[in-house]
């Protein structure tokens, strides 16, 4: 069998644009006359796809599939909306979203072509899920923490699949993560299989809109199944050869947790893009750096080999984690590379 030719980024983008145009054309064929719509109601966005969204009515709790009014482009899970129900359904569509209420927060993900793309709204807590398989990456944890701190969303670190570890191995993981507890982050050690830490996780999620983020294969969907047993979300299988997740949730979706609180399961991402941030924003997002900011000899200190850098001195004195400090510089370097690649992509796009 001939091997399928891999699509270029430009071809992938054109296919995606054509799909969106078809969805928009389908939505445009459903025209709601004012006489066909009821009174305005409040609702919560459960999930959004193309020109449609599933809206939970604030009064009845029923989920209705709705079209979006023209001009509503940014609509994501967690958004609070004003919508109107049709007197009868049309082609499976129950109503129309009229407006989006102001957000308290919005989690965005950078896109090389389209800039910042919203992922979820009105988030109270970012649950950063890691696992012992795929291999734990502190660099990726730090990227998510930067995102949480920059957006003003409280982070919660969760290490999943601890049932795969012997007691001595678990102690090693606790040692690796001790630096995060030292600077004030809460860490939970959990396992769906053994049930360890699930009750504590439930308690941390109550009375909040939470978003689960993390690499593919870390078990976000398996934790959703543990928290909401009546759901049967397809779980990512782990390849024995690569150790990477073969399946990942394709769209962000909000779920109600029986024990209290709401949960948004987001698409898995390999790493969290931060190229849209300035280096100064990355620096401020490191909690342990904050007491030292403004104390370096030079105002434009890069906190590397600069003379009189008190952050580097704090690292040498054991006051700041060397691992976190090294990750900081790797992230700053990768930001510069990604910004250059993005500019190249924009120039290439302009030539198409």
From Swiss-Prot:
Gene Ontology MF terms in the entry: GTP binding; GTPase activity; metal ion binding; rRNA binding
Family statement: Belongs to the TRAFAC class YlqF/YawG GTPase family. RsgA subfamily.
HAMAP family documented for this protein: GTPase_RsgA
Cofactor annotation remark: Binds 1 zinc ion per subunit.
CDD domains for this protein: YjeQ_EngC
InterPro entries, alphabetized: G_CP_dom, NA-bd_OB-fold, P-loop_NTPase, Ribosome_biogen_GTPase_RsgA, RsgA_GTPase_dom
Binding site for GTP: 160-163, 214-222
Region Disordered, annotated ranges: 1-24
Domain CP-type G: 104-272
Subcellular localization(s) per the UniProt record: Cytoplasm
Cofactor: Zn(2+)
Function according to Swiss-Prot or TrEMBL: One of several proteins that assist in the late maturation steps of the functional core of the 30S ribosomal subunit. Helps release RbfA from mature subunits. May play a role in the assembly of ribosomal proteins into the subunit. Circularly permuted GTPase that catalyzes slow GTP hydrolysis, GTPase activity is stimulated by the 30S ribosomal subunit.
Protein name: Small ribosomal subunit biogenesis GTPase RsgA 1
Gene Ontology BP terms: ribosomal small subunit biogenesis
Oligomer status and interactors: Monomer. Associates with 30S ribosomal subunit, binds 16S rRNA.
Enzyme Commission code(s) on record: 3.6.1.-
Gene Ontology CC, one term: cytoplasm
Record-annotated disulphide pairs: none
Keywords: Cytoplasm, GTP-binding, Hydrolase, Metal-binding, Nucleotide-binding, Ribosome biogenesis, RNA-binding, rRNA-binding, Zinc
Binding site for Zn(2+): 296, 301, 303, 309
């Amino acid at each position: 069998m001939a091997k399928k030719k891999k699509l270029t980024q430009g071809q992938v983008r054109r296919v995606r644009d054509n799909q969106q145009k078809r969805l928009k054309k389908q939505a445009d064929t459903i025209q709601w006359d004012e006489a066909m719509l009821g009174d305005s109601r409040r609702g919560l966005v459960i999930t959004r796809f193309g020109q449609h969204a599933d809206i939970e009515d604030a009064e009845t709790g029923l989920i209705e599939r709705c079209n979006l009014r023209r001009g509503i482009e940014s609509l994501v899970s967690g958004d609070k909306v004003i919508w109107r129900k049709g007197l009868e359904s049309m082609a499976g569509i129950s109503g129309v979203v009229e407006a989006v209420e102001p957000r308290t927060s919005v989690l965005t993900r950078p896109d090389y072509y389209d800039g910042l793309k919203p992922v979820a709204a009105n988030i109270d807590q970012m649950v950063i899920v890691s696992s012992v398989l795929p291999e734990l990456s502190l660099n990726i944890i730090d990227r998510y923490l930067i995102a949480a701190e920059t957006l003003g969303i409280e982070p919660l670190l969760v290490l999943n699949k601890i049932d795969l570890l012997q007691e001595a191995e678990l102690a090693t993981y606790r040692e690796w993560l001790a630096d995060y507890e030292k600077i004030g982050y809460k860490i939970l050690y959990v396992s769906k299989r053994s049930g360890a830490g699930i009750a504590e996780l439930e308690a941390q999620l109550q009375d909040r809109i939470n978003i689960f983020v993390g690499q593919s294969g870390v078990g976000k969907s398996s934790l959703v199944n543990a928290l909401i047993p009546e759901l049967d979300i397809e779980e990512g299988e782990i390849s024995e050869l690569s150790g990477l997740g073969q399946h990942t949730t394709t769209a962000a979706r909000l779920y109600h947790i029986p024990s209290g609180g709401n949960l948004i399961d987001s698409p898995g991402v390999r790493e969290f893009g931060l190229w849209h941030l300035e280096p100064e924003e990355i620096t401020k997002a490191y909690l342990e750096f904050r007491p030292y900011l403004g104390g370096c000899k030079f105002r434009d200190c890069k906190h590397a080999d600069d003379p009189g850098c008190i952050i580097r001195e704090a690292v040498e004195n054991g006051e700041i984690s060397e691992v976190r400090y090294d990750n900081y510089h790797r992230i700053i370097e990768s930001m510069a590379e990604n910004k250059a690649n993005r500019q190249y992509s924009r120039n290439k796009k302009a030539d198409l």
